[in-house]
Amino acid sequence: GEFIRGLMQTWPGQRVLLLTHVKELIAQNYDKLMTLWPDAPAGIYSAGLNRRDTDHDIIFAGIQSVHKRATEIGHIDLIIIDECHLVPKSGMGMYLRFLKTMNVINSKIRVVGLTATPYRLNSGSLIDGDDRIFTDIAYDVDVMQLVNDGYLSPLVPKAMDNEFDLSEINTRAGDYKTDQLHALTDNDALARMVLVEILAYGRQRKSWLIFCTGVNHAEKMAQIIAEHGITTATITGATPPDVRDTILELFKSGHIQCLTNCDVLTTGFDAPAIDMLVFLRPTQSQGLYVQMCGRGMRLAESKNDCLVLDFGGNTQRHGPINALKPQGEQKAKGSKATPPSRTCPVCKTIMAASCTKCPDCGHRF
């Protein structure tokens, strides 16, 4: 929001289009700009939000709504793509098709991407490749700097006693095979053992977000958690939009304490009060891992940190959020698949191997 306001005030007469992929992000980005700059000449183009503004100097749009309507949008000077790691590396997807047409309308158009994960699964950096959209990283900031400066909430990842055994799970297209993960987690005994740890750690936590391997898994976990008096709901890709909106509002307002989901609340979902993440979804995708972590790093009143219960071994696999190495770079340099980390023998907090003192309990190594 501040970037757009500064741009428009420094160079009046520019037209800016901010693109993203879900209506929740469109609304969040628009609302934040209007809070920062109430007189902003901003509109929204999104079928999901029932708005199709085209005459404003600043337009917040969904790619699904505009990818075939470039001529309606007209001349744009700057396109900002939020969550730009979702732009495909090659081919004519919605983003690439739209950008190609917009470039015909204005050959001097510029494109800026915003993301917490400037790389894709198994394809390295967003600025690599002959057909890349982005040529340079203009600004990069370390996660720990943002935490130390008070812009993000710290994560406290914990190793679990009932961490999933993935030794028999195969890989397809760079990640664990979905059907095998479903079979692994479709186990009542395992679910009950996991539940014991979730309840023990969650007693002092107010807002839980749980990532599951599939729809059945998400619904099962919600059911057994609710049996213990925890207000719980589930969101999946099949949840009707009006039901989804109601559930999210109840979760954000604290009327629902626990929300389980399957691959729908990983990118751009903004619920600052979340103070416990539960990873029941193992992944080899570092991008997905970082996005899941990001759901707990928003600041909120009376929130000191966000606990991460990692049953999928993701933190050990990819490294703590402040000690990551992109998978593409790891392979290119021949480095180990798992960045170095260590686990506190006292409180089970996972941290960078370079740490000499546990950031949670103070144990010295």
Which stretches of residues belong to each language-model region?
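A conserved SF2-helicase RecA2
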Residues: 139, 143-153, 300-353, 364-365
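Post-DEXD/H (motif II) to motif III coupling segment of the RecA-like Helicase ATP-binding lobe
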Residues: 88-157
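Inter-Walker segment of RecA-like/P-loop motor cores
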Residues: 34-71
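Conserved helicase ATPase core of P-loop NTP-dependent helicases/translocases
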Residues: 27, 43-54, 219-223, 230-262, ...
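Conserved Walker A/P-loop ATP-binding site and its immediately adjacent core
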Residues: 2-3, 7-35, 215
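Conserved interdomain linker/interface between the two RecA-like ATPase lobes of SF2 helicase motors
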Residues: 135-212
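Conserved RecA-like ASCE ATPase "motif II neighborhood" in helicase/translocase motors
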Residues: 58-83, 88-98, 261-262
